[in-house]
Amino acid sequence: MSDLEQLQSQILADIASASDEAALEAVRVATLGKKGSISALLSTLGKMSPDERKSEGAKINLAKDTVTQALAARREVLKALALDARLASETIDVTLPLRESPAEAGRIHPLSQVWDEVTTIFADMGFAVAEGPDIETDDYNFTRLNFPEGHPAREMHDTFYFNPKEAAGSEAGEKPSRLLLRTHTSPVQVRTMLSQKPPIRVICPGRTYRSDSDQTHTPMFHQVEGLVIDKSSHLGHLKWILHEFCKAFFEVDNVNMRFRPSFFPFTEPSLEVDIQCRRDKNEIRFGEGEDWLEILGCGMVHPNVLKLCGLDPEVYQGFAWGMGIDRIAMLKYGIADLRQLFEGDVRWLNHYGFRPLEVPTLAGGLSS
């Protein structure tokens, strides 16, 4: 074996034994660097005769190419080994239980919890979830819901209006309709009736806005409304749905409900619903007692609303209801002040919040 072949074999052995990229770089410098062994051989070619230079130069360059390829291959192997070691050191066991410290484990906000509970209950009854924009037109928020011009709810002190110059047409060719922050989620019902053919069975949860702020009111709050439209729906169906919802939501075997006549522009007849309860100091117990507590409003969809949404009231009828998610959250979980829901106090959230990954189910208990 020639000296060049021995040198090449030794270099390849050093490359194969390099345990990391730093060691491999040291081999490269010792071999191909300015003062490396192969570089030194290349520097001797100038002293040779033309024939020797041609013969020896080809051998040395072949050895250089072989070493260069071996260095590149070993470098890729070492990179893969380094990545595997890094991944192994950073592995997280996702099967480990959550830490108990409130500072290390977050909590689900009561509003998020109740939102999930409500949608779970109505989904079990076959309702879909419909959503719409927070910024609405006067047409969808009021006119198509049978609010006449001059109705108190249209006044500035109740509704957040945008600049009068910012307006949009509800339908092509119609005159512009003023923009506002929706005061209820009922516009979603309007959009649903305009875009879908009956039968319709949806709930409409979302944020709503009114110019009001005290212990039981905030400028932004959450509502969930429901809508059923078909050819044979009646108040008996509405009563059953609300009764089943209250039993499931408050997690009681039975609940007494009281339906009182009321007035809403978009329903006729209109009703307000009270639920029987017992007040025990700072706690409210449902399904027992002699007290009554208002929880929602409802009624049969007004024929004018059906007409304004493109449905024939001689063929279709339906019912709707609405309740405040914030309010029923306060009632169920004993929250005294509505404003606390929006203050972002971590101590309050640690007390009233829920553990993550506990998804509400009817079979497993909504809030267990």
From Swiss-Prot:
One of its GO terms (molecular function) is ATP binding. Binds 2 magnesium ions per tetramer. Mg(2+) binds at E268. Its EC number is 6.1.1.20. GO terms for biological process: phenylalanyl-tRNA aminoacylation. It is found in: Cytoplasm. Pfam families: Phe_tRNA-synt_N (PF02912), tRNA-synt_2d (PF01409). PROSITE patterns: AA_TRNA_LIGASE_II. SUPFAM superfamilies: Class II aaRS and biotin synthetases, tRNA-binding arm. Keywords: Aminoacyl-tRNA synthetase, ATP-binding, Cytoplasm, Ligase, Magnesium, Metal-binding, Nucleotide-binding, Protein biosynthesis. Its cofactor is Mg(2+). GO terms for cellular component: cytoplasm. InterPro entries: aa-tRNA-synth_II, aa-tRNA-synth_II/BPL/LPL, Phe-tRNA-synth_IIc_asu, Phe-tRNA_ligase_II_N, Phe_tRNA_ligase_alpha1_bac, Phenylalanyl-tRNA_Synthase, tRNA-bd_arm. It catalyses: tRNA(Phe) + L-phenylalanine + ATP = L-phenylalanyl-tRNA(Phe) + AMP + diphosphate + H(+). Gene3D superfamilies: Bira Bifunctional Protein, Domain 2 (3.30.930.10). Belongs to the class-II aminoacyl-tRNA synthetase family. Phe-tRNA synthetase alpha subunit type 1 subfamily. Tetramer of two alpha and two beta subunits. This is Phenylalanine--tRNA ligase alpha subunit. It comes from Nitrobacter hamburgensis (strain DSM 10229 / NCIMB 13809 / X14). The gene is pheS.
